[in-house]
Each structure stands twice: as C-alpha cells, then as structure tokens.
C-alpha cells in the first residue's frame, strides 16, 4: 500500500510541474486526500496486529477513502492528458469534471478517516439479540 501511495504522490508531483492555475483546487484536494489516506493506512498497519477487529470495523470507510482518492487521481491524470486535445468535447469536459470531483467529492475522505480509525468498541458493544431488538423496534416506527 505504501508503494501504491508513493506512486500516486510521485505522479502528482510530476503533473503539478506541468499543470497550471486551473489545477489549483485539484492539486490541493488531492494532496489532502493523499495525506488522509497515508495517515489512515498507517493506523491500519499499526493496529492490525494487535487489534484486528478494529481494522475490520474500519475497513468499509477505509476502502471508501481509497476509492475517493484514486478517483481524484485518475480524473486529474485524465484532465492533464486532455489539455492538448483542442476541439474534442470529451477532452474539454475533463478539467471541469476533475475540478468538480476534487471540490465536491474528494473532501469526504477527510470525514471518513474518523470512522475508519474509530475502533471496534461500539461495534461489539451490543450482542446479537439486543441489536436484533433495536432493529425490530426501529422498523415499526
């Protein structure tokens, strides 16, 4: 995972050198998303050996962080590649699409970090019967 993150960061650095002002928000949000992903990955790796249930409890939000960051990275690559394709409507849409994703969707990665690293205490606080009672009562409302 660390190698994958390092590859994304290195590719981002190379693109940053070529990208202009239009890529500012993409660059900022992708950098923040990568930081969140690296921190959350570090927590997962440190916690996994001693508390695998906590890692399992956080696995879904952790994978969502990965998806958001990789999506932003791929859209940024696509927008940069499309810059030289004048007259192509699909190419022209790449930059606004990447910017929209970076500004509207990618920031959710920061919010998911807390859920990914919250641990398993509350997940296992209720036994199965008690949880079933809660679900049945809630369904009636």
Description of each model-found segment:
Residues 7-141:
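C-terminal amphipathic alpha-helical interaction region
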């Amino acid at each position: 995972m660390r190698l994958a993150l390092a590859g994304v960061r290195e590719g981002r650095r190379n693109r940053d050198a070529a990208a202009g002002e239009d890529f500012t928000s993409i660059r900022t949000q992708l950098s923040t998303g990568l930081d969140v992903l690296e921190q959350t990955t570090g927590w997962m790796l440190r916690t996994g050996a001693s508390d695998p249930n906590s890692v399992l409890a956080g696995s879904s939000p952790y994978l969502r962080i990965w998806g958001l960051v990789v999506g932003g990275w791929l859209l940024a690559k696509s927008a940069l590649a499309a810059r030289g394709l004048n007259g192509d409507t699909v190419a022209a849409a790449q930059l606004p699409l990447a910017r929209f994703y970076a500004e509207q969707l990618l920031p959710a990665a920061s919010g998911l970090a807390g859920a990914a690293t919250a641990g398993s205490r509350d997940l296992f606080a209720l036994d199965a019967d008690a949880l079933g009672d809660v679900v049945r009562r809630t369904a009636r409302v």
